[in-house]
Amino acid sequence: MSGDKKSRSVIYKKTSRDKAVSVYLGKRDYVDHIESVDPVDGVVFVDPDLLKGKKVYVTLTCAFRYGNEDIDVIGLTFRKDLFFARTQVYPPVEDVKCLTKVQERLMKKLGNNAYPFVMAFPDYLPCSVSLQPALSDVNKACGVDFEVKAFSASNLEDRYHKKNSVRLLIRKIQYAPDQPGPTPRAETSWQFFMSDKPLHLTASLAKEVFYHGETITVAVTVTNSSEKTVKKISTSVEQTANVVLYSSDFYTKTVAFDESDEKVSPKSTYKHTFTLLPLLAYNREKREIALDGKLKHEDTNLASSTLLKEGIDRTVMGILVDYKIKVTLTVSGLLGDMTSSEVSTELPFILMHPKPDSGAKESEQEEDFVFEDFARDQLKDELQPEEKEEEEEDEK
């Protein structure tokens, strides 16, 4: 057994059916740092003999899917492109400046027919997010996804064929901020009819940012100076997905819940710490819950909170996700349960993944490349209708 402990770096590769074009990417997840976004940097390898004088282009697309693309309603597809960019890679029209180490090593390994490309995201695009479909809607999609495509054509006016193109799904993601905001705390008072003094509710969290899979504790204090009895206290994590396309729709779903049936009598004080754990595992049957975008055959989690660059309009098209803790008191009325009322307060918080250790890769030059092919069946569900027809013809 070899004693070589050299680390390995995965390179994602996909080749067109006609073998003329191959795309190499060093990663599939591109990080939105709020102030800037990682560019999509890769390498295209071409076979000039198979291209027969054709040019090679690379495109970057952000699309909003909101239905089953197999169905075409009066000529309308269930897809809207939010962003599209294109560049000619071969023959190169301009040199790519400041190549990454991965690009440099790939070009050295692949030889003279390797050409680098860099494409940038604008700062207003949403991250990769989808809405969980109902169990009966397996083939339907609603969400934002990103795609890198390379294709060969004599010119841009010509319609290229599926066999001359390569499509790779990527993700745009965000990580938890380095400097979280102040600790969330909220309080409210409620004056009841025929009570001289109010009911006071205070709720607080230990911090603003929680990671996926982390338990959230909510400290609740009820100071009941009124003549009413608090019959129940409940806490919940509510996810709000703002879906902005042709209109602005809000989907609010409860993704975690805890309650106490202990009564708070008049002229008394009650303190309790509630525990909440928002996980997709507990919500797989709930429709329209927002999830982080996923690549085929991979699991995902509840969608991360959306962080926007200062000055960016929140009506940007896509799906924006927010979380809050809602604390609700159920208070008895004059006629008992028939006239119960509720007192509530809310605590906004952030739910995200932690930022990976930036020092994990110090010597990229010492790494071996491991090439991982993008499986063609991974993208089969994502093909547009006309492309599916072409693929079926190619397979005959």
UniProtKB/Swiss-Prot annotation:
Keyword Transport belongs to the record: no
PROSITE patterns named among the record's database cross-references: ARRESTINS
Biological process terms in GO annotation: G protein-coupled receptor internalization; signal transduction; visual perception
Pfam families cross-referenced by the UniProt entry: Arrestin_C (PF02752), Arrestin_N (PF00339)
Matches recorded under InterPro entries: Arrestin, Arrestin-like_C, Arrestin-like_N, Arrestin_C-like, Arrestin_CS, Arrestin_N, Ig_E-set
Keywords, alphabetical: Calcium, Sensory transduction, Vision
Entry keyword annotation includes Calcium: yes
Entry GO CC: photoreceptor inner segment; photoreceptor outer segment
Gene3D superfamilies (UniProt xref): 2.60.40.640, 2.60.40.840
Gene Ontology molecular function: any one: G protein-coupled receptor binding
PANTHER family the UniProt entry points to: ARRESTIN, S-ARRESTIN
Comment field (misc): Arrestin binds calcium.
Protein family membership: Belongs to the arrestin family.
Function in brief: Arrestin is one of the major proteins of the ros (retinal rod outer segments); it binds to photoactivated-phosphorylated rhodopsin, thereby apparently preventing the transducin-mediated activation of phosphodiesterase.
Name this protein carries in UniProt: S-arrestin
Source organism (scientific name): Aquarana catesbeiana (American bullfrog)
Highest classification ranks of the organism: Eukaryota, Metazoa, Chordata, Craniata, Vertebrata
